[in-house]
């Protein structure tokens, strides 16, 4: 969800079926609303007036309207709506009571709040306006109106004057519930940071998460609330429905998926004894029935001792499994038999075992390990091949020493890349709340510097990784080869791992060519490429098999190494920063060189800073903790992408 203010009104409101029959329309019942539509805009029913053009930034005061009429003839309501402060002062000084409601039971403070007139609100408060005055058909406070309209700056101002967001309107909704229903997530975050509980029930006993799951079709704001630690198994007061019950009744597939991922119980029963699956059958939704049944079956399996053991030791077991599978394929190909039918049957059996294991045992977490454990298996069989095939033909101690150093470097830098914290940005709940309040009140609650997934302030050059579900300082990319992120703290180790891996592959090419030249005489000029491949296959199928996956690893590792060194040395950028800049360049009328960025200090200095080279004091690298480097304001971090939920 984009946290930038837009023009569109949200028609979700409070319409639609409710878990407990609470579902009235959302209208104030008054006839005029002026000012910007706001973030998640709200337009009262029966609107007939003209909207004053509003700002795109919800933290700024609206522009004054260039109305053709002379404001000296306006009544105080119209002057308030259009921001004519001097006319308002004139009428108040003439004796108008700022606490007096109009014929629709709406006070001047309501009109100032819904139109985001900060200076007029300040003036009315100084003249004795009641901050939490209830008014309108929905019996709402000015704060409720500002929340519905999406005016974050007005919400902040009213709360500074003592407005109480925990008060309920005529429909029973408190401030946080309204922010969620109108999908004003910055306001919801601010209210929670100021002390509103994420599971605060409305007067009908429903939490914000229940309302989101029931009334707003789509992943948000359900996902947002779960990230704020909303309870997925809370129940309402009327029917004891959980958020999952509400989502199923509303047919909200996205919310159901998110709630299940968050661990919502599929066995919880409401007052009528119905589970979520029972309700899915009642609403005749085959998709929801399938989703809920699959999750229920998976959770039953997850309680088995076998799967618990697999999840506990998944890295080791998956590595062993990959080593066995890669070795089994090669061993079958290397069998001394002329029967390709037998080899085909054995290979088919191996594929069947893999398929069975993936269906019965492999979870999403286990499947994500396949590339990294496949790489580990490949390196293992490279070493075995060197020892059993190449070592007897290579008596040179220097070559053996260099190979040993190389394989040690590969293992060392690979482990360091995997085990070193890439720079995960961490913050306590109190720090998160403090940052939200500070950024909101400074007008900087913006996705470029505030992560809407982690709910915390992002350091400069940090990005949110959706695979790791964390913000990573100076993130380069998420690598499938280490099953983790490459960031500020493990990036040098990863680059050195690529260097060592490329040298290992070169040694394997050297050993393969040397072995073939001695044991497999080839006549390429006479037999052609297919004849040569046939000869190699007949000479040593295993070696040709190993050569193929060595070639594969050489291809991606060499390309990735060249790109990494180019970005580090010549640009001073990470992969994600380069991608963001290239995307923005396409929108610019004139091309701008990627080298023109504040992090590019020249080739030598870039390399010194990246690898932290000192050379006995000859070099002085820049030492920075990128998890603590914060931009000073909007626009300072030109390389960050908005990680909006």
Curated annotation (Swiss-Prot):
Gene3D superfamilies: Ankyrin repeat-containing domain (1.25.40.20). Pfam families: Ank_2 (PF12796), DHHC (PF01529). InterPro entries: Ankyrin_rpt, Ankyrin_rpt-contain_sf, Palmitoyltrfase_DHHC. Residues 7-20 have a biased composition (Basic and acidic residues). Residues 1-73 are annotated as: Disordered. It is found in: Golgi apparatus membrane; Cytoplasmic vesicle membrane. Residues 23-33 have a biased composition (Basic residues). Keywords: ANK repeat, Cytoplasmic vesicle, Golgi apparatus, Membrane, Repeat, Transmembrane, Transmembrane helix. Residues 34-43 have a biased composition (Gly residues). Residues 1-314, 358-369, 416-492, 564-645 are cytoplasmic. The keyword Repeat applies. The chain crosses the membrane at residues 315-335, 337-357, 370-390, 395-415, 493-513, 543-563. Residues 336, 391-394, 514-542 are lumenal. Residues 449-499 form the DHHC domain. ANK repeats lie at residues 104-133, 138-167, 171-200, 204-234, 239-268. The keyword Lipid metabolism does not apply. Belongs to the DHHC palmitoyltransferase family. AKR/ZDHHC17 subfamily. The DHHC domain is required for palmitoyltransferase activity. This is Putative palmitoyltransferase ZDHHC13. It comes from Danio rerio. The lineage of its organism: Eukaryota, Metazoa, Chordata, Craniata, Vertebrata. The gene is zdhhc13.
